[in-house]
Structures are given as C-alpha cells and as structure tokens.
Amino acid sequence: MKLYTKTAHELHDLLVRKEVSATEIVKTQADRMQALEPKIRAFVTLTVDKALEQAARVDAKIAAGEAIGPLEGIPMAIKDNMCTDGVRTTCSSKILNNFVPPYDATVVTKLKEAGAVMMGKTNLDEFAMGSSTENSGFFATCNPWDIERVPGGSSGGSAASVAAGQAVFSLGSDTGGSIRQPAAFCGVVGLKPTYGAVSRFGLIAFASSLDQIGPFTRDVRDCAHVMNAIAGHDAKDSTSAPVDYPDYTSLLGKPIKGWRVGLPKEYFGDGMDPEVKEVIEKAVKTIEDLGAEVAECSLPHTEYALPVYYLIAPAEASSNLARYDGVRYGYRSESADDLITMFKKTRAEGFGDEVKRRIMLGTYALSSGYYDAYYLKALKVRTLIKNDFDQAFEKFDVILSPTTPTVAFKFGDRTDNPLQMYLSDIYTLSVNLAGIPGLSINAGFAKGMPVGLQIIGKPFDEARLLQIAYAYEEATGCHSKMPDLGV
C-alpha cells in the first residue's frame, strides 16, 4: 500500500479501522521526504523526530479506544513564514536565518489541537515576495511534474510537498496569489479564504491588508477538513472576523444545478496560452454539464489590479519590514562601527534583491511627494475593484477564471524581467484586493503540466466554493493524478 498517495480522509479511515498506525504513516512520509528532497527541495527545516512523538500519542489514543478527529495523525507541512514554537522560522531569508519563535501561530496551534503532525517547514520566496521560489534566500524548489520548472510562489515549497506526496496537506499564505498560483502550477487544491476568516496571528507580515493563510490539499474534501480546523475568530488578530463559521464539509456532494456562474471577459483576453484556454473552456463546459448556468460578466476595474497591487503591497511591506534592523532579533552585521551603519549593513546584507526592490517601491509610494498621487489613488481604485465583484455577485453565485495565464515556466525564464514575473499573478491579484475567497483546482493538463481553474466567491462563502469544486472533481477525476518521480 502506497500511503503517500492517500488523502487525509483516506488515511483517517485506515487509522480508524486499525489497518495502519500513525507512526507507520509518518515513517512512510519521512522516507518519501528523504528520497525526494535532493530532487524537489521543498523543505527548509525538517521536524521528523517531533512528528514521530506526535504520532505515538495518536497511536496510544487509538489503542485506548478513543475516537480520533479527521486530521489526527495526518502529516502536514507549514510554510516557513508562520511561527512555530521552538522550530526555526526563516521566511527563507538570511535576515531571519536563526530566528526561533517562542510561540506558535494560531493556525499551527489549531492544527496541533486537531492532532495533525508537522513534518517540517517549507521553502518560499523570501518574505513571500515572488511567484517562483527563485527568490528564496536558500535554494529554489522544483516542480514535481517537471523539475526544470518552477512550482510557483511564493508558497512553492508547500504546493510541491503536497504534489510530490511528501506531505498530505500543507499551509501557505496568499497575498496576491501565493496559494492559488503554485496550486495551479503543481496540480493541487489551494484555497485563499476570505480576509479575516483565518487568523493571521503568528504569520510574519508582508502586506497586512492582503495576507491570508490557507490550505494546500490533494482533494477538495481534505481542504474542507483543514478549513474546519483553522477557520474561526481569534481575539489575538484584530482583523479576524467574529462571524459564524460553517462545517465546510456540509455541502460536499450536493448538486450545483441552477447555479449562476460568471465568466469575466477581462480574464479571457490576450496573454493566455491557447492550450491553457482550451483546458479552461473544457472545464467550463463540464460545469455547464453539471447543471450550472454560465454567462459572461464584467469586472472592468480589474485591469488596474497589477499597478494597484504593486503600490499597496510594497507600501505595506516597507512599513512591516522596517522592524528588521539588527537590534532586537534576526541577522546583525558585525562589520559596522556605529548604529546607523549597522542598520544599513544589516539590511543590505540580510535582504535579497526582490525584497529590496519592493521596500524601495513602497517607500517611494509613501513619500510625501507621491503619497496622494500613487498610494491614495491605489486605495481608491482598490475600492472600485471590490465594487466590481460586489455588483457581479448580485447576479452570479460564483465566478470562474483561469488561475494563471500559462503553465509553470522554466527556471530562469523570468528572473531578468520582473514585470513578466508579476504577470503570472494577473488573474489572482484582484481577489486579494477585494478580500474575497478564491480556490484553485486542477482543471486538466497542457504541455504535460497542470492547469488551474480558479473559482471566486462571495465573502465567507468558502463552503459553496468547495461544493462546486467537489462536483467538478467528482466529474473529472483530475485530482487523482500524481507526478511520476521514480520513487
């Protein structure tokens, strides 16, 4: 039995029937990680010893005849920008290379309470700034479907670990597409929840009004189970929403007949690879065959999403990253003779090129001479983008689009052209600006690589996104395919 091919709910059934132990599952995952890490490089830090201790506790619970929850004993991975008590948390940056937090992020606490077993911390673009993991301060992660291609970013390690069978599920963060884009590139499920639905306490901030934590899973049911564990109000996060949260599995398997589905004309224009377009059109036809009513809609202001995002996100980043000064924690340059020089050298030596670029962009946008012309104007257009979605959702239940305009690109293809790199998130940025949920599922394949279908919903309507995604998954079976890694 190849345990690494199983989903969380399949492993749960095996545990309940005592056909396998949690320790066996963890050892299988550890062997898989050891065999694949030289090739995939998804992890920054491994925590297998701690995972085995956690698994032993789950086995003892089962042996005592106690009931276990759907995630108990299930191996997971955590993106390395979420604090983990006693485990190094680097943001894949030299400036935090030796930072060990004294507490867990709320999502980590919740998953531990749910009995999930952490196998390690995954690689990312430094401070979550990037779309390929090529900006990691340590190494680039490879796409399990083709190791010469990127896994996407910034949560590339989290997506690759699930696609390769190194983790059953993982957590990522999404500021402009950093869950959905790598999910599309790696052929897994990736959900960016509504802003405020999942606590950001313990997430190392990039852009605080845009950041959101969400899951990567191999199928939609697993995604629902992880959301049940991590969603909910948290008093430690002032932006956490005090609303009623549903059972995210409750609508799975229910029909979508009569649903009104919108296709934004702005998302189906120039720039999309013809083969990707073909896969998406076929996916839309499948949704129609399932009984949904599909019609064109318009999101006119989303054409400004890219410049709006690259004014707001760097502005917030320049403020958030001001704390890395070499004084309180993190890297400190030892070659400085005075305090000001120490600040300058610490940041010059500790940050990578993309992080420096975005700090400079943000500082420029916030400077007194340009604040009104750039930053404030971007905030106003952000409101117009949100209004576009509000108006569309008066007529439609969900909106469908490609997740990305192309399949995963090869290493080095876009490193010398930042704008081309930024354009890989062109279909995902608006969802963050509007604060609404977006889900990417595998729609099929083009050029032998996965293609993502993005499903966008109303605020706090994640359960219905999962419902339509589950219906599509059941109709196509695309989620069941795994890359052949020769192990």
Swiss-Prot record:
Answer yes or no on keyword ATP-binding.
yes
User: PROSITE patterns per the record?
Assistant: AMIDASES
UniProt-listed Gene3D superfamilies: Amidase signature (AS) domain
Alphabetically ordered keywords of this record: ATP-binding, Ligase, Nucleotide-binding, Protein biosynthesis
Cite the EC number: 6.3.5.7
Recorded catalytic activity of this chain's protein? L-glutamyl-tRNA(Gln) + L-glutamine + ATP + H2O = L-glutaminyl-tRNA(Gln) + L-glutamate + ADP + phosphate + H(+)
Among the GO biological process terms of this entry, one is: translation
Self-association state and partner proteins as the record states: Heterotrimer of A, B and C subunits.
By sequence similarity, the record places it as follows: Belongs to the amidase family. GatA subfamily.
Its function? Allows the formation of correctly charged Gln-tRNA(Gln) through the transamidation of misacylated Glu-tRNA(Gln) in organisms which lack glutaminyl-tRNA synthetase. The reaction takes place in the presence of glutamine and ATP through an activated gamma-phospho-Glu-tRNA(Gln).
NCBIfam families reported for this sequence: gatA
What's the name of the protein?
Answer: Glutamyl-tRNA(Gln) amidotransferase subunit A
User: Which organism is this protein's natural source?
Assistant: Heliobacterium modesticaldum (strain ATCC 51547 / Ice1)
This chain is encoded by the gene named: gatA
